[in-house]
Amino acid sequence: KEFLLPLLKRNLKTVDDPFDVAKVFKSVRRNYFARSAIETAIFDAYAKSVHKPLYQLLGGNKDRIEGGISIGIKKTPKELIDTIKSYQKNGYRRIKVKIKPGFDLEYIKAVRNEFPEIELQVDANSAYTLDDIDLFEKLDNYDLALIEQPLGCEDIIDHAALQKKLKTPICLDESIDSLDDARQAIDIGALKIINIKVSRVGGLANAKAIHDYAKEHGVGVWCGSMLESGIGQAHNLAIASLENYRYSNDIMSSTCYLSDDIIKPQIEIGKDSFITIPEREGIGYDID
C-alpha cells in the first residue's frame, strides 16, 4: 500500500500485460509475498478481461494436475503410518514425510515396509548438514522419489557435494527464491528437482521464468504450498499446468487444512489423486 502499489502506479505505462508487473517490482529487494499478492490478483483480473482461464494465459497444457499431501513429524512410526492410511482413503497417492534428527531412518524404514509401492518423498526443511552423509546414504536405499531441502538454505555448494553421493534426486525448496537462485543451483549440480512456490518467488511470472529455465536444462519442477487459501491454491493449480511440472504437487483439497475455504466451489482431489483445473475465466473460482 505504501510502496509497491505507488511504484506500480508510477510505471503503469510500461505494463502491457501481467508479466510486466514483475519487471516493475524487480528493483524491490525481497518482499516476495507482497509482490506476489499484487501480481497474482492482476493476472486473475487480466485473464478475466481477455476471457481466458488463467492456466491457458500462462501457457499451461494440462487441464488436471496430480495433488499430494505433506505430513508433519509424528511421535511414532505407527502414528505416521496411520496418518498415511487416512490420507490414502481420501485419494492421495503421493506422500511426503517431514524428517529431522531422531525422526528419520526408523520412520522411513517403517513406512516403506508398510507401503512398498507408494510414491514417497522426504522433506528435511534444512535439518541436516553434510556431516550427516551416512544417514542420507542409508535413506538412498528406500526408493525415495526425492529428498527435499536436506541442508541449509544457503548451502548450495554442500548440496552439490551431497547430490554427487546419492542416486536419490535432491529437490531444493527454501534455497530457491529467484531465477538467479535456480540458475546457480542448476549450474553447479546442487539439485535435480525444484519445488517452486509462487508466493515465495514473488509471483507467477517469476515462477514461470524458473520453470522455463529448469526445462531448458532438463530439471523437473513441482508446485509447493504455503498453506494458501483457495485463492492462492487456484493460482498454484494454474501454474502447475505448465509442461515441466513433472511431479505431483503440494496442492490438496480445501478441506485438508481449512474447515471452510473462501472460494466456491471448493477444491477437491479425486480418488485418482488428480484435481481438475476449472475452464472458467481467471482463476476459475468465485469468492465465497
Each model region followed by its residue ranges:
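Metal- or metallocofactor-binding catalytic centers and their adjacent structured scaffolds
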Residues: 1-50
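Generic detector of well-ordered alpha-helical packing
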Residues: 40, 45, 97, 124, ...
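Conserved, mostly hydrophobic/aromatic
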Residues: 38, 51, 95, 123, ...
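Metal-dependent enolase-superfamily TIM-barrel catalytic cores that perform enediolate-based chemistry
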Residues: 56-166
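Predominant activation on well-ordered alpha-helical scaffold segments within soluble catalytic domains
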Residues: 5, 39-44, 109-112, 137, ...
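Shared catalytic-loop signature of beta/alpha-barrel
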Residues: 154-171, 176-274
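Structured core elements
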Residues: 96-98, 121, 146-148, 171, ...
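N-terminal amphipathic alpha-helix/helix-capping segment at the start of soluble metabolic enzymes
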Residues: 48-64, 267-269, 275-278
